[in-house]
């Protein structure tokens, strides 16, 4: 057989195979369309199948029609009732790790936001990590100078708890350089403070839509909690400060329902200073442990009732929990007055357990490094130094930062009490390290019925980054 004959033979065989393949497809389609629908045994071919995923990314409505899937993304159904949140706090023996985002480690090569002030808040179906971005990414030129607290680029965003604050999973919440957020059982409410120092505005969002505003009333950097607000039976409470950071300022508690402000009260606290309150629900009231940035190394305590009446004072315990602070042995404690005569401070938290108190603090007395939680017997009502439990979360060789409180609602845990939880921010970069940026990651711990061993769940990123070497 000569070469031309070989080519003709191969071509003929190939053409025959193509024709046979086409015929087989025609037969397959004919059987699918005409025969299978009539046999009564293929009920799933021409119907809609709903797949619900227990996550915030999406719910898929999948329509299957003749072997073709049509996917439509639909919104998560809203709950039809408010959370109660009038239960007492659970009594806990220690705190177990809930999540760790490792955002800075991942951000050395991933698209992760430069952030500060992360916090956690929970709905009946999920917990989310909220954070204030700087409008820039780690290891990028726009991260330069992000040690600054307030800028027009800062926004409140959130991810499902445990995720890094990355570009692909983050959800926009509000334009803000100070913020709070909480869920009433039906929708998320967020408050973002932004604007110039003298005329800042707090914008209330409910279900993602702006619903109300609060204008600065003292004209001096109006600001809020940097942690979860508190919703009880559909009404949500939070605390704001307006005025100097190092002397007497003005303080207000607010109440909103479905994103509309329905009440506010001025908190009279002459000689005391309140900032960055960490609040939680307990037996139908809102209990807050705050920051005194003026003179006290003990923390202000604010208890708010549903009618916005309140009690204000200081955490009674005979151990200081702010930073910087003096020696424990030199501290006496007070339920009514600032003690310690140390300016500045750091956001922190405490939980009432009957008359006892769990309180968090940095291990270092002078810098934001290390972190521990202490349980002090009768520390909520007396100047007690009786430390009955201690747990290390970050060792003193590693940086910490802000810390704050939240609770797991009974809808999540199926318990009859609210589980107390806290988060610890771990600040990296400026001013303590040689970088052009400042950012943070966080570790989240929740109360359990067991004692938990000391360990260090520190940030762990190796600095400087490439951008810092240019």
Swiss-Prot record:
Annotated membrane topology: Single-pass type II membrane protein
Region (Hypervariable stalk region): 32-86
EC class: hydrolase
Disulfide topology: 90-417, 122-127, 182-229, 231-236, 277-290, 279-288, 316-335, 421-446
Protein name per its UniProtKB record: Neuraminidase
Gene designation: NA
Intravirion-side positions: 1-14
Organism (species): Influenza A virus (strain A/Duck/Memphis/928/1974 H3N8)
Compartments in which it is found: Virion membrane; Host apical cell membrane
Virion surface side: 36-470
GO cellular component, one term: virion membrane
A Pfam family this chain is assigned to: Neur
GO molecular function: exo-alpha-sialidase activity; metal ion binding
Keywords carried by this UniProt record: Calcium, Disulfide bond, Glycoprotein, Glycosidase, Host cell membrane, Host membrane, Hydrolase, Membrane, Metal-binding, Signal-anchor, Transmembrane, Transmembrane helix, Virion
Keyword Metal-binding: yes
Region (Involved in apical transport and lipid raft association): 11-32
Domain description: Intact N-terminus is essential for virion morphogenesis. Possesses two apical sorting signals, one in the ectodomain, which is likely to be a glycan, and the other in the transmembrane domain. The transmembrane domain also plays a role in lipid raft association.
Activity: how regulated: Inhibited by the neuraminidase inhibitors zanamivir (Relenza) and oseltamivir (Tamiflu). These drugs interfere with the release of progeny virus from infected cells and are effective against all influenza strains. Resistance to neuraminidase inhibitors is quite rare.
Family assignment from sequence similarity: Belongs to the glycosyl hydrolase 34 family.
Glycosylation sites: 42, 46, 54, 84, 144, 293, 398
Cofactor(s) essential for the protein: Ca(2+)
Keyword DNA repair: no
Predominant location: virion
Catalytic reactions on record: Hydrolysis of alpha-(2->3)-, alpha-(2->6)-, alpha-(2->8)- glycosidic linkages of terminal sialic acid residues in oligosaccharides, glycoproteins, glycolipids, colominic acid and synthetic substrates
Active-site positions on this chain: 149 (proton donor/acceptor), 402 (nucleophile)
Record-listed substrate binding positions: 116, 150, 275-276, 291, 368
A single GO BP: carbohydrate metabolic process
Gene3D superfamilies given in the database record: 2.120.10.10
